Amino acid sequence: MDSQRNLLVIALLFVSFMIWQAWEQDKNPQPQTQQTTQTTTTAAGSAADQGVPASGQGKMITVKTDVLDLTINTRGGDVEQALLPAYPKELGSNEPFQLLETTPQFIYQAQSGLTGRDGPDNPANGPRPLYNVEKDAFVLADGQNELQVPMTYTDAAGNTFTKTFVFKRGDYAVNVNYSVQNTGEKPLEVSTFGQLKQSVNLPPHRDTGSSNFALHTFRGAAYSTPDEKYEKYKFDTIADNENLNVSSKGGWVAMLQQYFATAWIPRNDGTNNFYTANLGNGIVAIGYKAQPVLVQPGQTGAMTSTLWVGPEIQDKMAAVAPHLDLTVDYGWLWFISQPLFKLLKWIHSFVGNWGFSIIIITFIVRGIMYPLTKAQYTSMAKMRMLQPKIQAMRERLGDDKQRQSQEMMALYKAEKVNPLGGCFPLIIQMPIFLALYYMLMGSIELRHAPFALWIHDLSAQDPYYILPILMGVTMFFIQKMSPTTVTDPMQQKIMTFMPVIFTVFFLWFPSGLVLYYIVSNLVTIIQQQLIYRGLEKRGLHSREKKKS
């Protein structure tokens, strides 16, 4: 197998993968977009018995820190809107990215409270609690490292429930502390809960869209337990009422999308019930309900949980909860993408530019793979040297395919040639290529990351298609420089158009990925010349002139 056949193999693998990816996306098409009415109904099944009742309208209070801009409803204390000032909605825009939203078109909320037999959020105890708050707006002042937002509610029996949001400077993790003061004569039984609910269908203003050739990151629910470090749960599965019902100590529940996530992390030593539910009106939920806690008469009980609402910053998420960093969607090649990203981030700490970091990591990867590349070209050169013997054998044996196969294998063995030696480096390169793609599409650090000149976002396609064209040119040069034994007219035509076909595919790919491929091709050209010189010295004539 020569290098041009290798290009054909890469193309077939690549096209096959893209067709499979498109088929996977089309198997479960999104239902038609519909308007969503605002609702706060809760989960069915395991959590419905003591879940979140329908609630009347409360007062909206705002909380602003250096990284979060939240709106909290005093009816229940749910976070109904979350803006991220550090992340613009679009490149060059002053409008912050909106993660949580409550509008007639779209619902995405982080709900929490106290359920259980005596909890104020238990539907059996009436409407959700209407908390009292001392002011309507809270701001983390300059020089202030922590901001507390206390909300209090006193039930008909005189018991006081306090829900306090605790914000820290530069932190997307928000602690939610509960205090239960029992003024009665009987123990109070309460359980904390945290629930994330979201409309299944994305309205136009939230659907970023992508080309049919692009890989799509996961949007849906997820959870983690000590036994299952990271499990995805599709919105479609929840909408079909195939619900989760798992009990475990520790862990978390989350909702994910490209670059951003929300998660509830219970902070207790007891058992938590993780559940999903179809809430109706096109809304699904994932949540947890903690093990009940008894607060004795005259005593005050304390409970806490943590809400993550923000970008998927891996090191910060890992510090909040075990395996929370796995929510960064690197697909099925995460075991390659994660170390690649760590290496890329380490390089970036020195060079300060993600584009140059990609160039450097390309040289590193290709340098590590150089022995395999050299073995590949050596194997192909030996295969070309054997072509006269193979052709003579075929003419001698005629149509006896079995004997041809036997004698060919004997010839390979005698000459110490591995017919698959040229394929192995390609098998290694393809997963690295795809893993880099997942890394570019899933790492928040590369969102809107500039390179140089006209490339202002390495995670987006080249707006002028210059990089894809350059990639096609480098591929054309590799093809022209590579000796070939392809004689089939159809294969020759396919190989002629291969740079054009790849250029068209890469028009919609992230600029960072195209940059990687250009640099990789340039390295290939250099390595080819070095390897060919060595092969010529060994008498392996690799620079055959192509027939015009």
From Swiss-Prot:
Residues 28-56 are annotated as: Disordered. GO terms for biological process: protein insertion into membrane; protein transport. Keywords: Cell inner membrane, Cell membrane, Chaperone, Membrane, Protein transport, Transmembrane, Transmembrane helix, Transport. InterPro entries: Membr_insert_YidC, Membr_insert_YidC_N, YidC/ALB3/OXA1/COX18, YidC/Oxa/ALB_C, YidC_ALB_C, YidC_periplasmic_sf. GO terms for molecular function: membrane insertase activity. It holds the Pfam family YidC_periplas. Signal peptide: none annotated. Coiled coil: none annotated. The chain crosses the membrane at residues 6-26, 350-370, 424-444, 458-478, 499-519. One of its GO terms (cellular component) is plasma membrane. Interacts with the Sec translocase complex via SecD. Specifically interacts with transmembrane segments of nascent integral membrane proteins during membrane integration. Required for the insertion and/or proper folding and/or complex formation of integral membrane proteins into the membrane. Involved in integration of membrane proteins that insert both dependently and independently of the Sec translocase complex, as well as at least some lipoproteins. Aids folding of multispanning membrane proteins. Belongs to the OXA1/ALB3/YidC family. Type 1 subfamily. This is Membrane protein insertase YidC. It comes from Salmonella paratyphi B (strain ATCC BAA-1250 / SPB7). The gene is yidC.
